[in-house]
From Swiss-Prot:
Changing residue 319 to A: In XLA; moderate. This is Tyrosine-protein kinase BTK. The lineage of its organism: Eukaryota, Metazoa, Chordata, Craniata, Vertebrata. Changing residue 521 to N: In XLA; severe. The modification Phosphotyrosine is found at residues 40, 223, 344, 361, 551, 617. Residues 214-274 form the SH3 domain. The active site is at 521 (proton acceptor). 1D-myo-inositol 1,3,4,5-tetrakisphosphate binds at residues 26, 28, 39, 53. Changing residue 542 to P: In XLA; growth hormone deficiency. Keywords: Acetylation, Adaptive immunity, Apoptosis, ATP-binding, Cell membrane, Cytoplasm, Disease variant, Dwarfism, Immunity, Innate immunity, Kinase, Lipid-binding, Membrane, Metal-binding, Nucleotide-binding, Nucleus, Phosphoprotein, SH2 domain, SH3 domain, Transcription, Transcription regulation, Transferase, Tyrosine-protein kinase, Zinc, Zinc-finger. It is linked to X-linked agammaglobulinemia: Humoral immunodeficiency disease which results in developmental defects in the maturation pathway of B-cells. Affected boys have normal levels of pre-B-cells in their bone marrow but virtually no circulating mature B-lymphocytes. This results in a lack of immunoglobulins of all classes and leads to recurrent bacterial infections like otitis, conjunctivitis, dermatitis, sinusitis in the first few years of life, or even some patients present overwhelming sepsis or meningitis, resulting in death in a few hours.
């Protein structure tokens, strides 16, 4: 059994996993190890631990935070009378007896625990955050108030697993000043039995020993990276590095071969062992149609590309050959198969332990393929991905480092300009018009948004908040707004390119969905296109900070009625499912090459028709299968709409079928 890190008596609230389950409170002995948080019955008379009542795997915990105490708890949320005594003085309120609640959130919802002292609560929250810091599903937001009577008191959301309503801050368990209405009320002292456990000394923290490189993860740099601030470590493409500190954030602390240490962007490296990302022939995000186009452009016998398959976890080898007698040449796509023993093959008689070994063999032997793999084909000038911020920990940008080069346009919040950061890095600079945004709230949210990093999201680099107007600094996208791009280039698109645009947006939205982050204003006007034609989602979450009533009110002239589902139009109820609806409309915009949805109706007429069940027609460029995908986003019942994960899978299936 793993060593116990902490051991304390707390009051536990029942989790009410079933609607009929009663709400009650019981004293439990809680034990924390590196793997589990467990709670037991406790025999106070004998001072012994009783039977185990439940446990949570540490790896499943997504958040640990304080909870705002409930005001005036009703009788059903108070501790029952002691023994058979009937005096109301003996009916002790839970909040007074255990006045410091905190929550442990995991995949089944929140577990509420009440501590007798604030110091003990702080200690537990600190240790819990320490053991979960490498968990992959840590959330960005949480619910500061209790889940009671089928809803959260803080935001009235009725789904227990609903996305949080407040940005998560690292407060180590302390409530914000003034957040507890009972902050001056002293708790009752613990009983002698509890005091014996509470005063039990914690195990001493072991002295930090130097970590051997043999115990560290080794990575290889995929791109060069020049440090942007004093905390960063330089990367050289192809060099190996050891990871000293890895987290779910986009920056890792690393050590190079010379012993230098610093932070590196995690999307610039890949694991050294058996990784294929470092090879010239591998193109991770290339689609089938893009591979075919590139191979035909090269036109070389035996030209090949290894890419991610549309089937999760699979790879495909795309090969070009002229030797078949077809003057245009032909392309074959071979899925890399694997045996139960994890050996890879393209032809069953030839098994290999790694994909690089497999490719190396077929570079010398066709062995059933249309051609030997002679010539690796790759995208020219593979651009390094954007970093989450301009250096580790840098989110406040000095405006003196910015050079303004040209105006790009005017948006909801003000003028947008193209410029350079420190004369070297391309950036877009949004100059926020005073009075257009709830600035203080946005500045708090910007810290969270900077940690949202995905190749199909327009990266937020930082903000300038020391002067007015404030600036928002983002990744620069050379081809501008998707809506204008569709309208201006309308005669140059093939249907496969349109589907790839939908895939780009869906990948970004699947990522936001996994982070429980809502966009709230998804539309072609809020997507941008880079110089390689890749579409990225922009302005995610910004609509919450608009101060213009014409934009925020569902009856306002600027409200995105044409992208909104019935529950938003009628009740202003935003969720991931309202983003799904908007994505369906965005697909329609793409396939109509930038037409206005419901172009024959006014906003009020559109809202009325949507409520009556009217949906957008099939654009002539959209196949029946594509239209089925977009139509699935417009189900009247939000729960019946698919997730972005399902939508992406459906889009990839159609891409394979229609290419």
């Amino acid at each position: 059994m793993a060593a116990v890190i902490l051991e304390s008596i707390f009051l536990k609230r029942s989790q009410q996993k079933k609607k009929t389950s009663p709400l009650n409170f019981k004293k439990r002995l809680f034990l924390l190890t590196v793997h589990k948080l467990s709670y037991y019955e406790y025999d106070f008379e004998r001072g012994r631990r009783g039977s185990k009542k439940g446990s949570i795997d540490v790896e499943k915990i997504t958040c640990v935070e304080t909870v705002v105490p409930e005001k005036n708890p009703p009788p059903e949320r108070q501790i029952p009378r002691r023994g058979e005594e009937s005096s109301e003085m003996e009916q002790i309120s839970i909040i007074e007896r255990f006045p410091y609640p905190f929550q442990v959130v995991y995949d089944e919802g929140p577990l509420y625990v009440f501590s007798p002292t604030e110091e003990l609560r702080k200690r537990w929250i600190h240790q819990l955050k320490n053991v979960i810091r490498y968990n992959s599903d840590l959330v960005q937001k949480y619910h500061p108030c209790f889940w009671i009577d089928g809803q959260y008191l803080c935001c009235s959301q009725t789904a227990k697993n609903a996305m949080g309503c407040q940005i998560l801050e690292n407060r180590n368990g302390s409530l914000k000043p003034g957040s507890s209405h009972r902050k001056t009320k002293k708790p009752l002292p613990p009983t002698p039995e509890e005091d014996q456990i509470l005063k039990k000394p914690l195990p001493p923290e072991p002295a930090a020993a130097p970590v051997s490189t043999s115990e560290l993860k080794k990575v290889v740099a995929l791109y060069d990276y020049m440090p942007m601030n004093a905390n960063d470590l330089q990367l050289r493409k192809g060099d190996e590095y050891f990871i000293l500190e890895e987290s779910n954030l986009p920056w890792w602390r690393a050590r190079d071969k010379n012993g230098q240490e610093g932070y590196i962007p995690s999307n610039y490296v890949t694991e050294a062992e058996d990784s294929i990302e470092m090879y010239e022939w591998y193109s991770k995000h290339m689609t089938r149609s893009q591979a075919e186009q590139l191979l035909k452009q090269e036109g070389k016998e035996g030209g090949f590309i290894v890419r991610d398959s549309s089937k999760a976890g699979k790879y495909t080898v795309s090969v070009f050959a002229k030797s078949t007698g077809d003057p245009q040449g032909v392309i074959r796509h071979y899925v890399v198969c694997s045996t139960p023993q994890s050996q890879y093959y393209l032809a069953e008689k030839h098994l290999f332990s790694t994909i690089p070994e497999l490719i190396n063999y077929h570079q010398h032997n066709s062995a059933g393929l249309i051609s030997r793999l002679k010539y690796p084909v790759s995208q020219q000038n593979k651009n390094a991905p954007s970093t989450a911020g301009l250096g580790y920990g840098s989110w406040e940008i000095d405006p003196k480092d910015l050079t303004f080069l040209k105006e790009l346009g005017t948006g909801q919040f003000g003028v947008v300009k193209y410029g350079k950061w420190r004369g070297q890095y391309d950036v877009a600079i949004k100059m926020i018009k005073e009075g257009s945004m709830s600035e203080d709230e946005f500045i708090e949210e910007a810290k969270v948004m900077m940690n949202l990093s995905h190749e199909k999201l327009v990266q937020l680099y930082g903000v300038c908040t020391k002067q007015r107007p404030i600036f928002i600094i983002t990744e620069y996208m050379a081809n501008g707004c998707l809506l204008n791009y569709l309208r201006e280039m309308r005669h140059r698109f093939q249907t496969q390119q349109l589907l790839e645009m939908c895939k780009d947006v869906c990948e970004a939205m699947e990522y936001l969905e996994s982070k429980q982050f809502l966009h709230r204003d998804l539309a072609a006007r809020n997507c941008l296109v880079n110089d390689q034609g890749v579409v990225k989602v922009s302005d995610f979450g910004l609509s919450r900070y608009v101060l213009d009533d014409e934009y925020t009110s569902s009856v306002g002239s600027k409200f995105p009625v044409r992208w909104s589902p019935p529950e938003v139009l009628m009740y202003s109820k935003f969720s991931s499912k309202s983003d799904i609806w908007a994505f369906g409309v965005l697909m329609w915009e793409i396939y109509s090459l930038g037409k206005m949805p419901y172009e024959r109706f006014t906003n009020s007429e559109t809202a009325e028709h949507i409520a009556q069940g009217l949906r957008l027609y099939r654009p002539h460029l959209a196949s029946e299968k594509v239209y089925t995908i977009m139509y699935s986003c417009w189900h009247e019942k939000a729960d019946e709409r698919p997730t972005f994960k399902i939508l992406l899978s459906n889009i990839l299936d159609v891409m394979d079928e229609e290419s």
